[in-house]
């Protein structure tokens, strides 16, 4: 892989050290066909590719997506959603950025990607992978338009490399680009999944009619999972864009529904009845046929409803998003103006109870949903992607972007998820007999546990309290999730806090003599409220050093984090802490900063409790404890108490006083 040659600009242009023009940004394991081009790919800036580069075209059709050598049709189909909404486009690509003709141009590009409940700003340079001087991955219909390849590069940076984008779900990319919801509709049904269905049923026809009302409001994508014999030109596991639908009156008076399909490959691969010059066009007026054929861009073709339902396997539909940021129901077109979200986790041995087949199901995370008025409600469980190995963490020293919402190379999402489901019970009041409630049939639930990043329920709910229980299929399967609620009416969402053994407030210390240190601190927005280790701002959290003295062996240490709020206050923040051991002699030059390394011990997942603590054995040495809230920019005050057992022989009085004395020595109180 070589760096591309071009004219050296008069001013130095930005080079992204966190995502360099190197093999590490292209490949993850050289497992895809992309590896064969390793020695031929060069990196060039847009002004080195063409004379007058532009971010956006004057004619939207010139910005149409085209796929290159990378197998990321799923992401490119989702990008087409941005072309339907100026609001979404401005949300993802902030307007006003200096471009190549501007004096302020410095060779950088910033966009926003929605990640696990937050819009994250990601900045990279504009050096793009090329073959023989041309873009080798995504490009627009006009090759002097660069919004798409630049956005693709940012998305590759979020995932760790371009190769990580090889294969994925359109629905996942749609959520990342809109912050909303997406649905996948199976066009074949259960019977058709085995290839036994030749003619579409009434449900599938109703689905296509429904798309007529959605085509201008949201992205519609379709895919082929396993092409029929004789239709191999569509490809396998390939995603397409449904760019238009038209309902026509045939010459014989019949109703004909046509769908215009765009192939991201940029070539017309359809050989059906409604191909250009196909016999299907004889069924409609010649002027109508001419008009529809003239609308086709490169890579587009028309297909009739019956053919579409026979040849395609699945539809993905993104929920419309208004300029105010509200989702719109696909089924009723009502606005889902009320939203709530809370994080949660399945922890092995504690809260990973498995599905309803397991006796441990009641130990799963549980949430109260209060519905104040009759509402159409969507409840979604979004899994946090598992992280790749920490070999990317060394790049964290070169973070780019907004400090409190920036992307962290230490948090590169993976593509492996647990099989998850969600069930909902209605209860009369919040104080319930939990085993009895969970033994009853739920009022709503997912049909099965699915290996999808996000699953959701759609419900028409009457006012009252509901118990929501997200679960993995297997017991003790760990994972983190975000529970999201979208509703037409007012709702509230709260977590049911389980009392854990190591989080009991005011737990007594074991017998013996203890030295106690109390450290007071606070989390402040934009300063010391860095959030959990999932966020790049984590190192800004308060950090307290402490030491364990030499002794005959490890010392027993209890660390307690107490947040300052009233016990009756329902607005507890989810809190936790990590303990890092400071290396003897200091950090080596090649090692990442201490807080970007793996902690020695942790008190996680973050819990909605006033106090969390952990009792541990620590060898002599220097340590740092970092208390944090789960989300960044969550303000609050706290006290960290570090109690260290003092190992020395007990002194007994020769005079029996009737009761031995236990000494507790208060060593220091530090305010920060």
UniProtKB/Swiss-Prot annotation:
Question: Which portions of the sequence form the region Domain III 2?
Answer: 513-654
The annotated region (Domain III 1) lies at: 322-494
Q: Which gene encodes it?
A: CAPN10
* UniProt name for this protein: Calpain-10
Q: Does the record's keyword annotation contain DNA damage?
A: no
- Keyword field contains Protease: yes
What region holds the Calpain catalytic domain? 13-321
What SMART domains does the annotation carry? calpain_III (SM00720), CysPc (SM00230)
Q: Which InterPro entries match?
A: C2_III (IPR033883), Calpain_cysteine_protease (IPR022684), Calpain_domain_III (IPR022682), Calpain_III (IPR022683), Calpain_III_sf (IPR036213), Papain-like_cys_pep_sf (IPR038765), Pept_cys_AS (IPR000169), Peptidase_C2_calpain_cat (IPR001300)
Q: Which UniProt keywords apply?
A: Diabetes mellitus, Hydrolase, Protease, Repeat, Thiol protease
Family recorded in the similarity comment: Belongs to the peptidase C2 family.
Q: Which GO terms describe its molecular function?
A: calcium-dependent cysteine-type endopeptidase activity; cytoskeletal protein binding; SNARE binding
Q: Which GO terms describe its cellular component?
A: cytoplasm; cytosol; mitochondrion; plasma membrane
Gene3D superfamilies to which the protein is assigned, alphabetical: 2.60.120.380, Cysteine proteinases (3.90.70.10)
Species for this entry: Homo sapiens
Q: Report the EC number(s), separated by commas if there are several.
A: 3.4.22.-
Q: What does this protein do?
A: Calcium-regulated non-lysosomal thiol-protease which catalyzes limited proteolysis of substrates involved in cytoskeletal remodeling and signal transduction. May play a role in insulin-stimulated glucose uptake.
